[in-house]
Every structure is written in structure tokens, then in C-alpha cells.
Amino acid sequence: MNDWIAYFGPQNRYRFSLGELKITDDNLSVFETGHCRFLNDRLMVHDDRFIMVIDGLILNRKELFNLYQTDDLAHLVVKMREKNPDDFFQAFRGPFTGLFVEKNTHKALVFTNQTGDSAVFCYQRGDLSVFSSNFYLLSQFLKENRLPATFGVQAAHWMLTFGFQIDASTFIQEVHRLLPGKAMYLNNGCWSEVAYHRFQSGDLTVSEEEAVEQIDGLFRQAVKRCFDKDLEYGYRQHLADMSAGMDSRMVNVVAQALGYDKITNISYSQTGSEEERLAKRAVQHLGNKLIFGTLDPHEFIFDLEKLTRMDFGTYLYCGITGGERLLSKIDFNAFGAEQTGQLGDIAIGTFVKTASNAVNPSAVRCSNWLPLDSRYDVNPEHFENQDLYSLYTRGFLGAMSSWFVRKNYTFALSPFIDVDFMGFCYNLPLDYRRNHRLYWKWVKRYYPDALTIPTSRKRIPETLFEKSVDFGQRGLHKALRIGHKTLHGMGLTRSSVSARSSMNPYQYWYDTDPAMRTFFNEYYSKNLSLLDDFPETAAEVRAMFESPVILDKIMALTVLAARNVFF
């Protein structure tokens, strides 16, 4: 897949051997890398009036063509900008980034999409401003041109405490990420950053029945946008994720209801796990084909630097688990985009359990082993409640980071993050979304057959009988967990997680695989000295690696890999 990097500054002063120079003007150069599988959604135009760059997928491109009565993307952008000069791109849906320059006024803007599945990274120094859709490429541009680049200790702290970047920080201190829903504007020679879109919590006055009806209509529209993109490019066979959860199967169920019948599912997990069993049952129930990737042996654990480079150090390196290795083996001549159910659990649900305007950053942390550094603001975007804070940090900046890895093979899509769908859901009263209350009502009303497919997501018990059974099952599971933890503490079990049967039993692997322990220990010992100039970060990495919890060690190694890969 392709990426772009552009710099505003003196022409011919800077070089970039990893990209092909596509556009050059008085003070702007644009380079392109890779290859594009979706050319009709790609724009790289330079004429006497404008410079236009768009990368990604515009899922509602044909809708906009009909609205503006054109069938040319460049012409569409010009007409949209005439109507909305500052934020025409807010009407786009999908994973996109872009750049627009009006040559006679010397005005420019750079933008990213609303939901974090695409990104723009920015570097500014003196008369030079560099923007790129790929953080690794930007790091190499800085290195090749010997431009100042300092290790980002704040990004390291976020990685070691949250497991992902909760703000615009990157592992290069001089580079910041343009956050979801934001754009950069050049006016009178000065750049400014503006939010053009932000989801809002609301209390929309609508009954649950009306809400369910609108949810179904908007979700079907979102699924259609995603799957029609495959058909636009002649891909008759759709590639769709399938897990043990509810979200991926609802994408598949609704897609089938809309007539998309040629679906191949992809799934990956530990052999013999509940994840594998439930995912395969769902595939069989729906009559789809299946490409399954086993996580044993867990070879992706050793792809430390490769995965860190691919996800730009935005998330702990193994967040995608075996997904990258499985995608690398798929022949994408037969498939278009990767259809996923990403963030479905918070679109019609929520990360929070109680309504509160207070923001608790610790609620989205992957680890509480280290204290948060009081020098850093944990809520720089001033989110007004936990619901939105969790959506943007844990959701858009955390979970969506795996899409940077996936983009090396194809674009990933999810109807749950469709802006129209998600915007409606977040305007509903929180009580509707809590405990997936509205989610289950939607499925029960419109897709009752989906409830016959076993899932790892538990329904909230409704009848007295269901509540009594649920109470007994939870008591049994709790007793088993406590018993296993006690045995582990006595040294009578090898792993603190009885989860060899879970999807990603990291602790089990670490406890039972000498090669994994050797790899972790050797990488840590060999690379800790890279942080000699950053003693506070080195101390935090040391503390995390010495933690008995495997996830803490993974977070520590991610920081060391970032120090290696981006410098």
C-alpha cells in the first residue's frame, strides 16, 4: 500500500530516497511510496490553481458524486471546497488523509480523518514543515537530511503506563500526530491546528424502539459503504474478520442480509482455544469460507522491531497478535478491503459503567505498575467525561493502531466507526448503551438468528431464571480463578493464567517457552544502554521489565524497539 510525505520549504534543499517525487512547486515537494490498490480513491493533482493529495478510501465517494453531479474526484474536491472552504473533507467517510494548496493565495491545509484509523504526522522547524501519513517514513526523512530528532520521553512514558499514546506524542519529540478530527491550516505564512470534528455525548430525546430502528438503518448504510467499496474495484469475494465476539459476526450477518454472499472469513487464535471454537462455529453457521491462522507457535512475539515500525510505536508491539503474519500470507489479488467489527463494543456500547463527568485516566491503562508522571497532562484535549475520553484514547488512539499494520497489505474497514452511525450512537442517553442494552435489543429485533450463534460476549440476563444461572456461573468461574491463582502462588502451576486456551495466552507462553524468555532477556540486556541519555525513562523501562507481569515486559520492549527503529 502507498503513503505520502510532503514538505513545505526551500525547493531542492531536502532529499528523500525512499519515495518518488510526484509534485514539486515553488516551496512544496510531495513524495509517494508503495503502490496503490484503490486508484479511484487516490488523488495526486498539480495544476495552475491547486495542489491536491488524498490518500485512503472515501467510502461515500459515489454518494458525493451524485450529490455534486460529477464523476471526477478532483472536480468533486474543488466543488466541495467552494461550498465549505475550510473543512470540505468533513463530509468524507472512511480512512483518509490529505493535503490541499490554493496557489494564488498561498493557503494550505493538511487533514486526517475523524476516527484514528488514518493519521498524519507533523514536523516543523524554522521555514520547514513536513507532513506524512507514515511516521516511519518521516523518521527516515529526518535521518536522511540530518534534521534534529530527539527521543520522545513523554511518548515512552505513555507507552509504559497506558500501552499506547494517549495524545499527540510520538517517539520523536519534534514530531506530533494530528489527532482524529483535526486539520492544520496555513494562513499568512503561519500554521495553526483546528478541530473540525469531535463526537459529542448527548441525551437525544428518542425512545429505545426508535433508537433501535435508526441504529439498524445507519448500520446497514455503513455496511453497504464498506462492502460496496470491494465491488467498485471488481472484488466479488469479500474478506471479513471473524472472532469469538459479537461485533465481527454482526458485520457478517448484516452483510449477508444485504445480499453480500461471497464472504471469506479470517480468524487467528491459539489452537484449541475458546476463540477458535466459537469463531469456527460462527463461520460454519453462516456458510462462509475460512482462512485460519494458528498462534502456535507464537512466532509473532519475535517480530518486535518489524511490528513497532509498522504501527509507528503507537501501541504495544504485539497488539495485532498474529494478524500481520496471517495477512502477509493472503493473496490480495482476490480480495479488496479487510472488513472488521472494530470498536463495535463501544459504538452501541460504552467503556464506562456509570455516568460521570469525571475523567479517570487509569481506567484505560494497560498497566498500573508505574505511577503517572505529574509533569504530563493526561487529558490535554479536555474531554468532558470518561465516555469520550475512553473513546478517543483507548478506542481511536489505542485499538485503531493495528490498522497501520494492516495497511501494509490492504485497508481495514469497520461499519461501527462510520461517522454517521457512531455520531448517532453517542448522542443517545448513556443508559441506552451501558451493558450493551441497546445492542442486544437491536440484534433481537432485527437479526434474532444471530443470537443462536455462540459468542464470548455475555448477554445481560433478563429473566429471573437467567439471572440465577448467571450468578451461579460467575461464582464458579471466580472460584476457579482464585483456586488457580492460589496454586500458582504455591508454585504448583506453571502459569498464573489458566489460559492456554485463551486467544493470546502471553503469560503461558512466557512461562513455558525458553526461546521466548531468552529473546526477551537478550533484547532487553542488549538495548537498555540506548537509554543512557534518558535516565528516568531507563529506570521506568527497567521497572517494567522486572515486573512479573508479561504485559509489562512487552511494554518495556516496545520502548526499546522504538528507540532502535526510529533513530
Locate predicted features.
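Short coil/turn segments at secondary-structure boundaries
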Residues: F89-F92, S169-L178, D230-Y235, K407-N408, ...
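ATP-dependent adenylate-handling active sites, centered on carboxylate activation for C-N bond formation
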Residues: N12, H106, N188, R198-I453, ...
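PAPS-dependent sulfotransferase catalytic core
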Residues: A355, D449-F545
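Generic structural signal of hydrophobic/aromatic residues within well-ordered alpha-helices
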Residues: L64, L76-V77, L138, A155-A156, ...
